[in-house]
C-alpha cells in the first residue's frame, strides 16, 4: 500500500539569494522599534487596563456566571463610548454656531463634516443591534433578573444627546407618569437641567436660517415673489381646467387644484404657522422655514450648496435616531415580550410610544417636500442676488445683519 500520493515524488525547492537590487527594494523590515526605547505605548494611551477590565458580570458575582451577559455589557459600553463621541462632535458644532464662527464660510465645511460624522456613528449604532440580536430571548432571560433596577432609560448621555439636539421637553412621553429627569439624582439631574437651558442645535440652526440672504423684503424678497408665482400658476391651471369638457377626471383635477390652493394658503399664513408652532407640530420659526425652503429651491447656487448639505445631514440624524429607537423597540419586544422593563417602565409599550414625530427635531425639514413646485414657478434670481449667491466668500456677510458685523 502506497503512502501519501502527494509525496510519491520528492520535490526539491531551491531558494535563490535575493539579488542586490531586490535587497534594496525590500524595505519592509527597515523600520525602528521605537517602543523598545520606552515612552507612551498603545495600551497606556488608550488606558486599556481600565476599559478591558470594566466588564463585571452580575451573574458571576452571584455565583451563576452566564456567558451572554458579557456580550450584553460590551455592547452597551460600546454604545456609551459612541454616545460620548457624538456629544463631543455636537458640542463643537454648537460652539461654532454660538461663537459666530459660522459667519466664516470655511467653518461651514467643518460643521457639515462633523454633523456627517454624527450620522455615520448613528448608522453604526443602528447596525450594532444585529450583534446583540445573536443572543436569544432565553439567553437574556438567564441573567435579566440580575440587572434590576438598572435600565437603558438611565443612560445619561442619550438624554443629554436628545436635549442638545433639541427634543422639546413638552413633547417627551412621560416615564411612568413622571418627568424624565426624576429618574436621575444629584449631579446627573443637574447636568440634564443645564442641557435643557443651553442653546440647542435646533435653536442655533433656526437663528442661522433666519439670516438667509434673499429673504429681505427690501431686497430680493423671495417669499413675496414665491407666493405671487404659485397662486398665479394655480389660478391659470384652474381656469384652464374649467374650460375642459365635463368628466370625472375634470372634477378630480379641479378638486386637486383646490387642495393645492388651500395647502399653499396655509404655508403663506404666518398666524397659522405660529398656531402649529404652539401645538408642537412645527419646530422652526416662520422666518427660518422661509430660509430653509429658499435653500432647497436654490441649492445649486454655490453659496447654498454647503447649507443644503447641512440641512440634508440634519434630516439624516433624525432618520437614524428614529431607526435606532425602532430597532431598540423591536429587540426589546423580541427579548421580553410585553413584560415590564427592568427599571419599572411598561417596557415595549413605553418604548413604542417614543417612535413618533414627537421625538423628531428637524421634522419641518422633512415637510419641505410638501411645498415643492415646478422649477418654472420658482422666482428667477435677479442679477444682484445671483451674483451674490454665485460667489462664496471667506467672511460670509450674508448670514448676519450689518449691525452685527465688525
UniProtKB/Swiss-Prot annotation:
Its EC number is 1.13.11.11. It is an enzyme of class 1 (oxidoreductase). Heme-dependent dioxygenase that catalyzes the oxidative cleavage of the L-tryptophan (L-Trp) pyrrole ring and converts L-tryptophan to N-formyl-L-kynurenine. Catalyzes the oxidative cleavage of the indole moiety. It comes from the Eukaryota. Belongs to the tryptophan 2,3-dioxygenase family. Homotetramer. Dimer of dimers. Heme binds at residue 328. Binds 1 heme group per subunit. Substrate binds at residues 72-76, 144, 342. GO terms for molecular function: heme binding; metal ion binding; tryptophan 2,3-dioxygenase activity. It comes from Xenopus laevis (African clawed frog). Pathway: Amino-acid degradation; L-tryptophan degradation via kynurenine pathway; L-kynurenine from L-tryptophan: step 1/2. Keywords: Dioxygenase, Heme, Iron, Metal-binding, Oxidoreductase, Tryptophan catabolism. The keyword Heme applies. The keyword Heme applies. GO terms for biological process: L-tryptophan catabolic process to acetyl-CoA; L-tryptophan catabolic process to kynurenine; protein homotetramerization. This is Tryptophan 2,3-dioxygenase.
Amino acid at each position: 500500500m502506497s503512502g501519501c500520493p502527494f509525496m510519491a515524488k520528492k520535490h526539491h525547492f531551491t531558494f535563490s539569494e535575493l539579488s542586490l537590487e531586490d535587497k534594496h527594494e525590500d524595505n519592509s523590515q527597515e523600520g525602528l522599534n521605537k517602543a523598545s526605547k520606552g515612552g507612551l505605548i498603545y495600551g497606556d494611551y488608550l488606558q486599556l487596563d481600565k476599559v478591558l477590565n470594566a466588564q463585571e458580570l452580575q451573574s458571576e458575582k452571584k455565583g451563576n456566571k452566564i456567558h451572554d451577559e458579557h456580550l450584553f455589557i460590551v455592547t452597551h459600553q460600546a454604545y456609551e463610548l459612541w454616545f460620548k463621541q457624538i456629544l463631543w462632535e455636537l458640542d463643537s458644532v454648537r460652539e461654532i454656531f454660538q461663537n459666530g464662527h459660522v459667519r466664516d464660510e470655511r467653518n461651514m465645511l467643518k460643521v457639515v463634516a462633523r454633523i456627517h460624522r454624527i450620522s455615520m456613528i448613528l448608522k453604526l449604532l443602528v447596525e450594532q443591534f444585529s450583534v446583540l440580536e445573536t443572543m436569544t430571548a432565553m439567553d437574556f432571560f438567564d441573567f435579566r433578573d440580575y440587572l434590576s433596577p438598572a435600565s437603558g432609560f438611565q443612560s445619561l448621555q442619550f438624554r443629554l444627546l436628545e436635549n442638545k439636539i433639541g427634543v422639546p421637553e413638552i413633547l417627551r412621553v412621560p416615564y411612568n407618569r413622571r418627568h424624565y429627569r426624576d429618574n436621575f439624582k444629584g449631579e446627573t439631574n443637574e447636568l440634564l437641567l443645564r442641557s435643557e437651558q443651553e442653546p440647542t442645535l435646533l435653536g442655533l440652526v433656526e437663528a442661522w436660517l433666519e439670516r438667509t440672504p434673499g429673504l429681505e423684503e427690501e431686497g430680493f424678497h423671495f417669499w413675496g415673489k414665491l407666493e405671487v408665482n404659485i397662486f398665479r400658476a394655480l389660478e391659470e391651471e384652474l381656469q384652464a381646467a374649467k374650460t375642459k369638457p365635463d368628466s370625472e377626471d375634470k372634477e378630480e383635477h379641479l378638486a386637486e387644484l383646490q387642495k393645492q390652493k388651500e395647502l399653499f394658503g396655509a404655508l403663506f399664513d404666518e398666524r397659522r404657522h405660529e398656531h402649529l408652532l404652539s401645538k408642537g407640530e412645527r419646530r422652526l420659526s416662520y422666518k427660518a422655514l422661509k430660509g430653509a425652503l429658499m435653500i432647497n429651491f436654490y441649492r445649486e447656487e454655490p453659496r447654498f450648496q454647503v447649507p443644503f448639505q447641512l440641512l440634508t445631514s440634519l434630516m439624516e440624524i433624525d432618520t437614524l435616531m428614529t431607526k435606532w429607537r425602532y430597532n431598540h423597540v423591536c429587540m426589546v419586544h423580541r427579548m421580553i415580550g410585553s413584560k415590564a422593563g427592568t427599571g419599572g417602565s411598561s417596557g415595549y409599550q413605553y418604548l413604542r410610544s417614543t417612535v413618533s414625530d414627537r421625538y423628531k427635531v428637524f421634522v419641518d425639514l422633512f415637510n419641505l417636500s410638501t411645498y415643492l413646485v415646478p422649477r418654472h414657478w420658482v422666482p428667477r434670481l435677479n442679477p444682484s442676488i445671483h451674483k451674490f449667491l454665485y460667489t462664496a466668500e471667506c467672511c460670509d456677510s450674508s448670514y448676519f445683519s450689518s449691525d452685527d458685523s465688525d
